[in-house]
């Protein structure tokens, strides 16, 4: 899914002038970057979505524009990037990584479906990427996800602003992915990881922190939130920790 462009307006610390940083996010691409008909928009007369080629052209033009205007640009992906189409599955994600390298992504976080070909495959894909794979809540002491391009977070300096990007994997991965594909990977609850890493990121100089995740929102979010509040009231969760 290609998302719209967001712009972050920050106040410059030196002259008080606004700093503009453009943010592009994608998620759940599932290897679908070819031209296609948008039947979900109009089943009878579906418009054409030009896909990955048009997106690449758009990003190229935006890079020129932002550089000309003295603005920053950040491109992030929220995971589930290759499973779900023949293009993505034929080589277990390598073509998608090549396309993402061409776009110039700054970082991505793996989604649950990115483990469909196993943790070893995901580790190998990360070595081919020109951008880091981020996760902060996977316990990976004995799993294959151990190369130098896999990190809990990064801090990028853009237009004088230190932007921290923290990767958080959906903790339900333990329920939806076969144990043999996880290869010993265990997931910590998202909130505990976020609370643990943000102080470290701030002490490392992050002025602004972005949580990059494919956790989504549960369909029964009202019930889940009510259960969360009940656990706090029973002392099962320390909301101050």
Regions picked out by a protein language model, each given a short descriptive name:
Residues 7-16:
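Hydrophobic h-region of N-terminal signal peptides that target proteins for export
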């Amino acid at each position: 899914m290609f998302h719209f462009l967001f712009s972050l307006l920050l106040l410059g610390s030196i002259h008080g002038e606004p700093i503009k940083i453009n943010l592009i996010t994608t998620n759940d691409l599932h290897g679908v970057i070819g031209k296609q008909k948008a039947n979900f928009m109009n089943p009878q007369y579906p418009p054409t979505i030009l896909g990955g080629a048009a997106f690449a052209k758009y990003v190229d033009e935006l890079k020129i524009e932002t550089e000309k205007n003295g603005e920053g640009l950040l491109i992030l992906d929220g995971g589930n990037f290759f499973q779900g189409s023949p293009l993505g599955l034929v080589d277990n994600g390598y073509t998608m990584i090549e396309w993402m390298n061409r776009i110039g992504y700054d970082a991505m976080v793996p989604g649950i479906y990115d483990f469909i070909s196993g943790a070893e495959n995901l580790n190998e894909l990360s070595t081919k990427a020109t951008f880091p794979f981020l996760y902060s809540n996977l316990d990976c002491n004995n799993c294959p996800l151990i190369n130098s391009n896999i990190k809990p977070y990064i801090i990028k300096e853009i237009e004088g602003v230190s932007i921290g990007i923290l990767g958080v994997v959906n903790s339900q991965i333990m329920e939806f992915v076969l144990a043999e594909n996880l290869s010993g990977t265990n997931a910590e609850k998202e909130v505990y990881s976020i609370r643990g890493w943000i102080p470290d990121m701030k002490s490392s100089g992050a002025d602004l922190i972005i949580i990059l995740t494919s956790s989504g929102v549960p369909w029964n979010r009202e019930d889940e939130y009510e259960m969360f509040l009940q656990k706090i009231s029973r002392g099962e969760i320390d909301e101050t920790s």
